[in-house]
């Protein structure tokens, strides 16, 4: 548990020297493979299981473009806007306005890109959708920082449509409850070891 500092234990640091989550250790190989950073984990799993990654080179490059866009942009949303708007002990106007402006610029970019598209790479759901939805999708659905009204997310209609559609996916519903330790206990799955674990919860 990160609240107890488990990420600083020697076992965790061996898997991820940066002592952050998410971290993955794949034991299905002759030698365990340590994978850390969400983008790296998504790419590793997509290639390992040959899923959620386009096969065509042009679409694969497009997917990588947006995956790495999320990696570089999300800190402005989370560590920037999210921190000063939601977590900082003192509400400071300048950083809130500064990071809100950048977050809205990013949302506008996504909104334009998603026009006439079901997903980031067209009609195919990929790891770029998974990465971007986790932050920007949940933000537009009002699940992050209670900032939907402040950021006027309803004006980004293409992003909202995309976010709502992904939110309805059965795997997304399952994924949202894994390792969840707050909120309604009926929708928490603190550990997941097999697909049978989900049978205990009605989604």
Model-predicted segments: where are they?
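Hydrophobic/aromatic-lined pockets within catalytic cores
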Residues: 46-50, 71, 115, 135-136, ...
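Residue-level signal for nonpolar/aromatic packing positions in well-ordered secondary structure
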Residues: 24, 41, 110, 129, ...
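Surface-exposed helix-capping loop/turn segments at secondary-structure junctions
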Residues: 51, 112-124, 170-175
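Phosphate-coordinating loops and pocket residues in cytosolic domains that bind phosphorylated ligands
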Residues: 14, 168, 177
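GST superfamily/GST-like fold recognition
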Residues: 77-82, 120-149, 153-160, 165-166, ...
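GST-like domain detector, emphasizing the conserved glutathione-binding G-site
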Residues: 1-107, 111, 118, 201-203
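Acidic/histidine-enriched, glycine/proline-rich intrinsically disordered or flexible terminal extensions
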Residues: 179-203
């Amino acid at each position: 548990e990160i609240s107890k500092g488990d990420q600083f234990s020697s076992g965790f640091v061996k898997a991820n020297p940066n002592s952050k989550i998410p971290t993955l250790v794949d034991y299905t190989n002759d030698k365990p493979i340590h994978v850390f950073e969400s983008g790296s984990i998504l790419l590793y799993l997509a290639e390992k299981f040959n899923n959620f990654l386009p096969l065509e080179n042009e679409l694969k490059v497009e997917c990588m473009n947006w995956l790495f866009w999320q990696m570089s942009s999300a800190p402005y949303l989370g560590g920037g806007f999210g921190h000063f708007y939601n977590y900082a002990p003192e509400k400071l106007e300048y950083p809130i306005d500064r990071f809100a402006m950048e977050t809205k610029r990013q949302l506008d970019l996504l909104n334009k890109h998603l026009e006439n598209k079901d997903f980031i790479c067209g009609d195919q759901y990929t790891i770029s959708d998974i990465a971007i939805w986790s932050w920007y999708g949940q933000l537009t659905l009002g699940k992050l920082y209670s900032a939907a009204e402040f950021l006027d997310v309803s004006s980004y209609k293409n992003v909202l449509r995309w976010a709502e559609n992904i939110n309805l996916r059965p795997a997304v519903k399952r994924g949202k409850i894994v390792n969840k330790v707050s909120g309604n206990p009926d929708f928490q799955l603190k550990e997941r070891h097999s697909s049978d674990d989900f049978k205990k919860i009605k989604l």
